[in-house]
Amino acid sequence: MSATPRVRVLEIFASLQGEGINLGRPAVFVRLAGCPIRCIYCDTKYSWDFNAGVEMGVEEIVAKALALSVVGHVVVTGGEPLIWQRRGLEELACALRALGSVEVETSGAYPPTPELDRCVDFYDVSPKLSNAGVKAPFSPFYASSPKAWFKFVVSNADDVEEVERFVVAYGIPRGRVFLMPMAESPEEHGEALRRIWDAAVRGGFRVTPRLHIMAWGNARGK
């Protein structure tokens, strides 16, 4: 690892966690640059560029997060944050614990290093179904991690059936799985939620809304 680790940061902002196990929780978000997955429905396509944003040191990032005065929970997101492993992500996650619990949002394509895992409280994992338009690997590490919670982006009953097959294939505990409506606007969110409602009930899956989409659409920094 670098003696003075630096990562590329797109934005640091305070908001509510809009999805998943920490739904509605006030948090500081640290968005890192770069994603090799590139799902067709991605709502942060500006994060794909590995050279976007600005290079920042760990201490600088922590100081900016602290200045937002929202302490207790930090979400490291992207992009795909785990591409920064062994290039500063481990040091960043451990340093951010000064603010509270640390949640890492990931596609699940890459397993964490032991150094990273020690400093993460929650993995917010979003494995890619066929509706993503890409083929992405999935690390079995997350299926057995007590820190991992899963969000599947779904638009219809067929997507929910694919989630069922995925969960069974990897032995993922059903109680750790959330279905999440595919949407970029409040109107799309409501429509997708209605389409998946009955399938979620039949499959015994929890559903997470996307609060930021419901309130702000696809606005950046929310």
From Swiss-Prot:
GO terms for molecular function: 4 iron, 4 sulfur cluster binding; carbon-nitrogen lyase activity; magnesium ion binding; S-adenosyl-L-methionine binding. S-adenosyl-L-methionine binds at residues 79, 126-128. It catalyses: 6-carboxy-5,6,7,8-tetrahydropterin + H(+) = 7-carboxy-7-deazaguanine + NH4(+). Binds 1 [4Fe-4S] cluster. The cluster is coordinated with 3 cysteines and an exchangeable S-adenosyl-L-methionine. Binds 1 S-adenosyl-L-methionine per subunit. InterPro entries: 7-CO-7-deazaguanine_synth-like (IPR024924), Aldolase_TIM (IPR013785), rSAM (IPR007197). It comes from the Archaea. Residues 22-222 form the Radical SAM core domain. Its cofactor is [4Fe-4S] cluster; S-adenosyl-L-methionine; Mg(2+). Mg(2+) binds at residue 44. It is an enzyme of class 4 (lyase). Keywords: 4Fe-4S, Iron, Iron-sulfur, Lyase, Magnesium, Metal-binding, S-adenosyl-L-methionine. [4Fe-4S] cluster binds at residues 35, 39, 42. Catalyzes the complex heterocyclic radical-mediated conversion of 6-carboxy-5,6,7,8-tetrahydropterin (CPH4) to 7-carboxy-7-deazaguanine (CDG), a step common to the biosynthetic pathways of all 7-deazapurine-containing compounds. Homodimer. Belongs to the radical SAM superfamily. 7-carboxy-7-deazaguanine synthase family. This is 7-carboxy-7-deazaguanine synthase. The gene is queE.
